[in-house]
Amino acid sequence: MLLALTAYATWQEGDVIYINGERLELLGRPICLDSTLYHTLKDELPSNQPTVTSNWDGFTAYWSINNDKLYLDSVRCEAYDPNVKAVVGKSIPSITFYRIFNSYSAGNRIVASWVSGKIRVAKGKVIYYQHSGFERNYEEETILDIDKGKVIGKKEYHNFVKDGFAFDKLQENGAQEMLHKILPLHIERYPELVNVKRLIFRVKRARVDEKGNLLECNVQVVRPDAGPQLATEIAEALKNYHPWKVYYINGEYRALGIENWTIPYILHDK
């Protein structure tokens, strides 16, 4: 399981990591794993400048891996400067940097021995995005398994998307017409829906294969209160449709365009 480095309500810029001389994005804040380090560092940041929503912590850390060890090389504080109307920053002075991280120093370097778990580094285009923390995926990702600052495992992935239908397309014009083609419900089977203008359902869980077949689909009818038969019919109708959009992410085919969507379905327009 990837480290839950911290939680954020909006998209966050990643840290920077250099591996074999290549600059990559580290999708997380490993400094936060040591609360003492984190709060000591925060106390050193300028207090008179507002942070930006894309970097609530107010800093970006720069890391590198050499001889299978994870090093923290520097920290850059960043804030919004209203005078120039831009994000500005500068590196924390070396004397301050080494004072904060002194307990992890080895010679003239900081070994990130407080870090254990899996961290994710990435490059390339974003293929999946949520406006929350580091919830996004790139074309090229590497999962590093870290034990007390030492790299003990590595898995590299080439992620991609296969086109097909996904519920985000319902935000386009003609959404209900499109939905009714995919989901032709037999409303006559449900007399309790005679006077209901619309129902709302949620796909709680979904699973797809590499060809866009929907293999598994768990549906909940949110409104109105209906029996399990309607939810089952919706699930079966969705599974009969093909192809669905497929995300291949870090070794798994995922139904990100289907799962956890809440969908309104118009029964009567009057």
Please annotate each region the language model reported.
Residues A226-K270:
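Short, positively biased Gly/Pro-containing turn/loop motifs at secondary-structure boundaries
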Residues I152-N195, E233-K245:
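Acidic, low-complexity proline/glycine/alanine-rich linker and hinge segments
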Residues Y8-A79, V84-K85:
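Start-of-domain marker
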Residues E78, N159-F160, E192, Q220-P228:
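A short acidic/small-residue loop/turn micro-motif
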Residues D73-N137:
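An exposed acidic His-Trp-rich patch
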Residues V121-K162, K204-R207, N213:
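Acidic, small-residue rich beta-repeat scaffolds with periodic aromatic anchors
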Residues V196-P224, L238:
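Short tight loops/turns at secondary-structure junctions
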Residues M1-T6:
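Sec-dependent N-terminal signal peptides
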